[in-house]
Curated annotation (Swiss-Prot):
The lineage of its organism: Bacteria, Pseudomonadati, Pseudomonadota, Alphaproteobacteria, Hyphomicrobiales. Disulfide bonds: none annotated. Not known; does not seem to participate in nod factor synthesis but required for nodulation on some specific Medicago species such as M.littoralis. SUPFAM superfamilies: S-adenosyl-L-methionine-dependent methyltransferases. It comes from the Bacteria. One of its GO terms (molecular function) is methyltransferase activity. It comes from Rhizobium meliloti (strain 1021) (Ensifer meliloti). Gene3D superfamilies: Vaccinia Virus protein VP39. This is Nodulation protein NoeA. GO terms for biological process: methylation. It holds the Pfam family FtsJ. Keywords: Nodulation, Plasmid. InterPro entries: RNA_MeTrfase_FtsJ_dom, SAM-dependent_MTases_sf.
Length: 476
């Protein structure tokens, strides 16, 4: 009777929706169903999965792989075709993409991927690809999400994911480490990383004498270019080639060592480098703002909080220390984000700093304009902090003040927005040397715009300044 009841409930439930980015592997696809993720497998995929199940369970126990279990048999009827097995996974709260990660975050993901490959290889398995999209973060801790890419290792097989690893991990890291160019816009524009062929065009002659650069990037790019230009390609040679297991392991270990040593030039001045220490606040004013945030979080107890303009994460940490379980910070300054990520690693707090240019947030894009979801589709929270944030859009980038307020209040149902008036030294610097065209930028206009989108619960003037903190609760 219980099984019959389950079947009736399943029949009445909405059908699972395929995750838009899950279309490349026909042997197993991913679906969103109610409060969980379902993963289907055909018979071949189910056999391979069963052979690796013990290893995968070990990875789950180590926190390196998203948990899995078999879905109840009644759920099989939701899918058409020859489905041999259906897994269920916990629903990840947020999905992030490599073009939103900091240099430090991308580096952590690359090292995580390589270590996973090495450990799998020791147990007779390997990863079938090397896409960065298979890594997600819980705080600053990376985890792997694609169970079906763990395959039995075949003796002598080539590393078919080498090019993908280089373009989705190594080249974006080198772009910053060698040229001090951030990867975010390039990666987002291409989606599959930064092409090696494009990166090679940036290299000078001296770079060609680097053995690692030549072997992993320059030579493969040149060979690829040569193959593409041929009218006839002989695939037999590549299929006959063998890569001994020791050589495979040595290649992974070399990449691990190389990437571990990649650094950015912290001596170069960034837009907000040292901002926390050199802004227009006094220590007393900063402490006052922190106390206000602490009281807000203690009162409302948001599980997840979003910190817009997080810099190195000071106020995210205030939130975490006063009852928030998880903080996601956003900023566009690469040095601040790297410092914030390193801080998260060192403290083991559930804080993930991500890249965001609020003028141009990550859009929905890729195949069907749905393969990778946009910012607003993926990021929402119980509360939002927008401290010293709105004037960077309204003054520095001419976004209408009312639209800035509307955008911030969509991120969470409650939060704190700081209004920074024209009399503030920071805004005066922004307006220096340019015409002040912002006749409607004032606190009255700000308060009016906020009251149209939310209820103003409280406001607090930071002592010794003209900045005001507004606590809001959105009108539903």
């Amino acid at each position: 009777m219980a099984r019959m009841a389950d079947s009736k409930l399943v029949a009445a439930a909405p059908r699972p929706g395929r995750v838009a980015g899950s279309f490349r592997d026909p042997s197993g696809q991913v679906f969103h169903f109610q409060d969980r993720i379902l993963r289907t497998m055909d018979s071949a995929a189910a056999i391979e999965f069963a052979s690796a199940e013990r290893v995968m369970r070990q990875l789950v126990d180590e926190g390196r792989l998203v948990d899995f279990s078999d879905a109840e048999p009644s759920l099989h009827q939701l899918f058409q075709g020859s489905i041999a097995r259906v897994l269920q996974h916990p629903l990840l709260e947020q999905i992030t993409y490599p073009y939103e990660w900091s240099f430090a975050g991308l580096k952590a993901a690359a090292l995580f991927h390589l270590q996973l490959q090495l450990d799998l290889l020791d147990q007779g398995f390997c990863l079938s690809d090397a896409t960065a999209y298979n890594v997600q973060f819980e705080g600053s801790r990376p985890t792997f999400i694609d169970h079906l890419s763990i395959k039995p290792y075949r003796d002598g097989q080539l590393w078919y994911g080498h090019k993908q690893f280089c373009e989705q991990f190594l080249v974006p890291l080198l772009l910053r480490s060698v040229f001090d160019i951030t990867h975010h816009s390039w990666y987002r524009g291409n989606l599959e990383g930064v092409p090696s062929a494009d990166f090679v065009k940036l290299l000078s002659t001296r770079h060609w004498f680097s053995h690692k650069l030549f072997m992993h990037i320059i030579l493969p790019a040149k060979l690829q270019s040569s193959r593409t230009s041929q009218t006839k390609v002989d695939l037999g040679d590549s299929r006959a080639r063998r890569l001994p297991k020791d050589a495979f392991r040595a290649m992974l270990a070399q990449l691990y060592s190389w990437i571990s040593g990649l650094k950015v030039d912290v001596g170069k001045q960034s837009v907000w480098q040292g901002y926390a220490a050199n802004n227009t606040y006094t220590a007393t004013q900063r402490s006052d703002k922190g106390q206000y945030v602490a009281e807000f979080v203690a009162q409302h107890k948001p599980r997840t909080i979003i910190d817009l303009g997080c810099n190195t994460g000071d106020f995210s940490y205030v939130a975490l220390e006063n009852g928030a379980e998880k903080a996601i910070g956003f900023d566009f300054d690469p040095h601040a984000l790297d410092a914030a990520f390193d801080r998260s690693v060192q403290t083991s707090k559930n804080f993930l700093p991500l890249y965001l240019d609020a003028r141009n947030p990550s859009p929905s894009q890729g195949w069907g304009e749905r393969e990778r979801q946009g910012f607003s589709s993926r990021f929402s929270a119980d509360a939002v902090l927008a401290l010293a944030f709105e004037h960077h859009l309204a003054i520095a980038h001419n976004v209408p003040l009312a639209e800035v307020v509307a955008w911030v209040t969509q991120v969470a149902p409650k939060g704190i927005i700081e209004f920074v008036p024209k009399e503030d030294e920071t805004v005066r610097r922004m307006l220096a040397g340019r015409e002040d065209i912002f006749s409607d930028y004032n606190e009255e206009a700000f308060a009016s715009a906020l009251s149209q989108k939310a209820r103003v619960v409280n406001k607090h003037l930071i002592p010794g300044s003209k900045r005001t903190l507004y606590t809001f609760e959105r009108s539903e």
